[in-house]
């Protein structure tokens, strides 16, 4: 039954956003309900963002699909996610990338996300409890970096950890609005490749909690 609900959810996403076949397959293979808090299970297959603990949210599946596809997913190996949250975005990425690394700064969310990912047997996802602004130098460089929270700017540490020619996608705070931007690394610096759309994400915060 849940797989049917997940399929129908992906149909609704596809009506609004032309899904890459690999992204659609990834979205259909990961049951969103696993990542949704118990009080909101009946909303798991809607296109709504849903509240979690610590004043955080599990993103809309439409947003997850878009952010995944904005990474330009063909012929890439590794991705670093900043802001693991529920683990849903990392789980979707795991169906496309050979190696997924995700950082979460809130310990309670980190513990729950790691457990969910382990329960699903997603052994190619590695989760770390740390300040995402510092990245994860041990496994760098990464082909792709994805921010699942809104940044005012991109820390130099993350630019350094992105492969030359690699792509970074992030919601960026500009004045009173947020916009999703895709950057490419050229000559050791980030260049805006495309401004994709307006958005609404929780902010990137320094330190751990």
UniProtKB/Swiss-Prot annotation:
Give UniProt keywords alphabetically.
Cytoplasm, Methyltransferase, S-adenosyl-L-methionine, Transferase
Q: What is its EC number?
A: 2.1.1.77
- Molecular function as annotated in GO: protein-L-isoaspartate (D-aspartate) O-methyltransferase activity
Gene Ontology BP term (one): protein modification process
Recorded catalytic reaction(s): these are: [protein]-L-isoaspartate + S-adenosyl-L-methionine = [protein]-L-isoaspartate alpha-methyl ester + S-adenosyl-L-homocysteine
Q: What class of enzyme is it?
A: transferase
- Superkingdom assignment: Bacteria
Compartments, record wording: Cytoplasm
The question of whether Glycosyltransferase is a record keyword is answered with no
The active site lies at 59
Q: Short name of one Pfam family for this protein?
A: PCMT
- GO CC list: cytoplasm
Question: Does the keyword Lipid biosynthesis belong to this entry?
Answer: no
Where it mainly occurs, coarsely classed, is cytoplasm
The UniProt entry, under InterPro entries, shows: PCMT, SAM-dependent_MTases_sf
Q: Give the record's family classification.
A: Belongs to the methyltransferase superfamily. L-isoaspartyl/D-aspartyl protein methyltransferase family.
Describe the function of this protein.
Answer: Catalyzes the methyl esterification of L-isoaspartyl residues in peptides and proteins that result from spontaneous decomposition of normal L-aspartyl and L-asparaginyl residues. It plays a role in the repair and/or degradation of damaged proteins.
**What is known about its subunit structure?**
Monomer.
Which PANTHER family has this protein been placed in?
PROTEIN-L-ISOASPARTATE O-METHYLTRANSFERASE, PROTEIN-L-ISOASPARTATE(D-ASPARTATE) O-METHYLTRANSFERASE
Name of the protein this chain belongs to: Protein-L-isoaspartate O-methyltransferase
What organism is this sequence from?
Answer: Helicobacter pylori (strain J99 / ATCC 700824)
């Amino acid at each position: 039954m849940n797989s049917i609900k997940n399929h129908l959810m992906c149909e609704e996403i596809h009506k609004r956003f032309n899904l890459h076949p690999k992204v659609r397959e990834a979205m259909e293979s990961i049951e969103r309900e696993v990542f949704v808090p118990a009080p909101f299970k009946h909303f798991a297959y809607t296109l709504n963002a849903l509240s979690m603990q610590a004043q955080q949210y599990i993103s809309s599946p439409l947003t997850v699909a878009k952010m995944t596809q904005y990474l330009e997913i063909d012929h890439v190996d590794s991705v670093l996610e900043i802001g693991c949250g529920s683990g849903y975005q990392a789980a979707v990425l795991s169906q496309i990338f050979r190696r997924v690394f995700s950082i979460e700064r809130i310990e309670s969310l980190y513990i729950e996300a790691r457990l969910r990912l382990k329960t699903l047997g997603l052994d190619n996802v590695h989760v770390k409890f740390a300040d995402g602004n510092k990245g994860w130098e041990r496994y760098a460089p990464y082909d792709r970096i994805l921010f699942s929270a809104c940044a005012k700017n991109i820390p130099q540490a993350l630019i350094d950890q992105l492969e030359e020619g690699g792509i970074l996608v992030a919601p960026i705070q500009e004045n009173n609005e947020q916009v999703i931007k895709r950057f490419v690394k050229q000559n050791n610096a980030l260049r805006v490749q495309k401004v994709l759309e307006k958005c609404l994400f929780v902010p990137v915060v320094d330190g751990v909690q």
